[in-house]
C-alpha cells in the first residue's frame, strides 16, 4: 500500500485513493535535481492553481450543502420523519469525504508524491473506500426502505421507528467497513528488497486482482444491481396501479394492492382501500411527519420523507366524485381528524344506503371529513409519484458519477490499458457526487427548499431587526 516510487505495471492504479502521475513521466520522475535538490511538480503553476481552486470549491460546496441538509432535517418539522435519518447519515459521509479525503488526494495529485507518511496513507485509503462504499449502501438501504413501504404498507410503516432506522444505518456502516478494511489486513509490500530505493514515496492501495474485483463488486456493482432490481419492481407496481380504470379510481374503488388483488371497502367511506381493522392502506404509502402511530399535525399539507415539489393546491387539484366544496374551516378540521385514523377505526359511508353495519348515516360534517380524506389521498398519490422520481434522480446521479471510475478500474485488473489522464478524470468526477445531493433536494424538494431558505435568511432577519 505504501511503498517507494517504482515504475507501474500497465493498468496499475490506486482506487479511490491517490492517483499518481505516471512513474515514467519525465515531467517529474527522474527530474529531481542532483544531490537531492527541489522536486519538480507534475503540473505547471497555472494548472496547479486551477486544480487547487476547483478542488477547493468542490470541498466548500460539499461541506456547506450537506451541513444545510443535516440542519434542515433536525430543525424542520416537515423533515423529521424517521427515514430522513438516512439522508443525515448520507450527508455526513459526504462531509467526511470533503474534509478527510479530498484535501489529501489534491495534495498528492499536485505534488506528485505522498508527503504524509505511511500511517496516514493506510488510514486515508481505508477512509476513502469506506465513505464511497457507505454512500452507495445508503442509497441501497433507502431503495429497500421505499420498496418495503410500498409492498408491506401499514405493517412496515408501523415498524419504521427512529430506533429501527438508526439500527439500519449502523448496519450500513458496518457493511461498508467490512468491504473497505481488507486492504489494511492484506497489504502487498513492493519495492522493499535490497536494491536502491527511489526517493519518491508512493501511497497506493492493494492492487491485487482479487481485491480490485471483489472491492468493485462489493462497493459498487452489487449495490447498484440491488437498486436497479428494486426500482424495476417499484416501477412495475406503480404502472400496474395506474392501469386501474378511471371508473375504479373514485373514493369507493380500491387500487390494486401489491399482491395484485383488489378489495372494496366494507362500509368504510371514501378511503381507497381497507387494511387490517379498517385502516386506510394507500398505494405507495409512506410515513408522515414522525414516528408511526402518531397523528400527523394539522396543517396546510402532508409531508413525506424526501417529500417532493408540489404546489399549494396539490391536495385540491384532483378530487374524486362526491362532495366537492367543503368549507375552508370545516375542511381543515376534517383533515386533521382524517389523519388520525388508526386500525380499528371506521368512517361512515356517503350516500343513501351506504352505511356500514351499525353505522348511522353520514351527516354533513362527516361527509366533509370523507371528502377531505379522499382529496388528501389523491394529493398524496401525486406526491408519491414525484418522490419515486426524485429518488431515481439521486441514485441515477450517483451511478453516473461513479460508474466510469469503477468500470475502468475493473478493466485495469484484467489487464486492459486505460489512459492515465482519463482515469484521473473519472476519479475526480466521482468525488463531485458528494456535492450534488443538496442541489437535487433544493431543485425537487419543496420542504428542503423552504428549510434552506429559513436557515439562510434567519441571520438577515436578525440584522434587520
Swiss-Prot record:
Residues 75-85, 145-166, 233-389, 445-465 are cytoplasmic. Changing residue 68 to F: In FPLD8; uncertain significance; decreased function in adenylate cyclase-inhibiting adrenergic receptor signaling pathway. This is Alpha-2A adrenergic receptor. Its main location: membrane. PANTHER family: ADRENERGIC RECEPTOR-RELATED G-PROTEIN COUPLED RECEPTOR (PTHR24248), ALPHA-2A ADRENERGIC RECEPTOR (PTHR24248:SF24). A lipid is attached at residue 457 (S-palmitoyl cysteine). The chain crosses the membrane at residues 49-74, 86-111, 122-144, 167-187, 210-232, 390-410, 425-444. The gene is ADRA2A.
